[in-house]
Regions:
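Bacterial N-terminal signal peptides that target proteins for export
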Residues: 1-12
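C-terminal motif of bacterial Sec signal peptides marking the signal peptidase cleavage site
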Residues: 18-21
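Bacterial signal peptide processing site
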Residues: 23-26
């Protein structure tokens, strides 16, 4: 088992999205349940047209606003940071271009390619339908996590790679690890397995995406976030830990936090309110080691970074831990 896949990414400025399509944003009635979805588009940053990954009863899609708080919530939140602000780790422009974790939507006829894994014993074998145009997190010359996320809209499957590199002169790839998820199933990875993420979770379902925030006007799932220190333990839906720290006051992978219902979001711009409402209703799940309170999203030149930056004013003290299930420590 891979015990340490610690990934620290320092992506500066936080950015938040704009709801250009939401008019004045005078209405506070943000949807909290899915409507009738359409057929997802194709390409980089393609809209899913309201289609939500995984069944409605999946952990990512389960509302937690009425769930009990964990009895150790105060200590766990303090260990991440009471005064540190929320930080959207995505946006329209930083260092000459958009930043975040990109994705691409492909059709079911996209040819599969071979991927060679460093951690093959915890990676899913098989052909991965990675198009030539597939974006790499951080860009083709980056040295960071280099995630590659591919959604097959017709077979409704998700393919994810960590530390992905195209093989020169070939259509094939190498990667640190990889995972394939059936988006119509609740199946988890084997216990103790990593994925393209440290916690053994899928990445794509936890991203803040432009099509949801702006086109749909609602984010109807939990989000993905990171913390600089985690525990040598995990809780469902996570399947893997990435730390040797055994303190009960450190957050385990898979821990879910939510924005307190009493936190006033009325002064935030419309796009920020959509994201904050998602954090109240669905919360966010600890998925990797990284900068404290960084939430993940897809890069897009259409984001309004000024609006995204308003999220930085939300302190860690505004969150609480949702009651956790059984901790897995070995």
């Amino acid at each position: 088992m891979i015990e340490t896949m610690t990934r620290f990414i320092s992506v500066p400025a936080l950015v938040l999205c704009t709801l250009a399509a939401c008019g004045s944003g005078a209405s506070s009635a943000i949807p909290t349940a899915p409507g009738q979805p359409g057929k997802p588009g194709l390409g980089i940053n393609a809209s899913l047209q309201g289609r939500r990954p995984f069944p409605d009863d999946n952990a990512w899609n389960t509302p937690v606003d009425k769930a009990s708080a964990d009895p150790n919530s105060d200590a766990l939140i303090a260990s991440i940071g009471l005064t540190k602000g929320l930080h959207p780790d995505f946006g329209a422009s930083y260092g000459g271009g958009p930043f975040g974790i990109p994705y691409v939507v492909v059709s079911g006829s996209t040819p599969g390619v071979s991927v060679t894994f460093d951690y093959a014993d915890e990676s899913d074998p098989g052909a991965y339908p990675i198009p030539v145009s597939a974006p790499i997190e951080g860009g083709s010359s980056s040295s960071g996590d280099r995630h590659v996320l591919v959604v097959d809209r017709d077979h409704w499957k998700l393919y994810e790679l960590y530390a992905a590199y195209p093989v020169a002169g070939s259509v094939n790839w190498t990667a640190g690890s990889g995972a394939i998820f059936d988006l119509s199933s609740d199946a988890l990875r084997p216990a103790g397995w990593t994925s393209a993420d440290a916690a053994g979770l899928p990445i794509f379902p936890g991203l803040v995406r432009y099509d949801e925030v702006v086109e749909q006007g609602a984010v109807l799932h939990a989000l993905r976030f990171t913390a600089s220190h985690s525990r040598h333990a995990y809780v469902a839906p996570a399947r893997h830990y990435a730390s040797s720290d055994t303190s009960s006051n450190r957050p385990p992978m898979g821990m879910r936090v939510r924005l307190k219902g009493t936190f006033d979001v009325s002064a935030f711009p419309p796009s920020a309110r959509v994201i904050l409402q998602a954090l109240k209703t669905y919360g966010m799940i600890l998925a990797d080691n990284g900068s404290d309170w960084y939430i993940s999203g897809a890069p897009d030149t259409r984001w309004n970074d000024s609006e995204l930056n308003t999220l930085k004013t939300v302190p860690g003290s505004a969150f609480e831990v949702v009651a956790m299930g059984t901790l897995v420590k070995n």
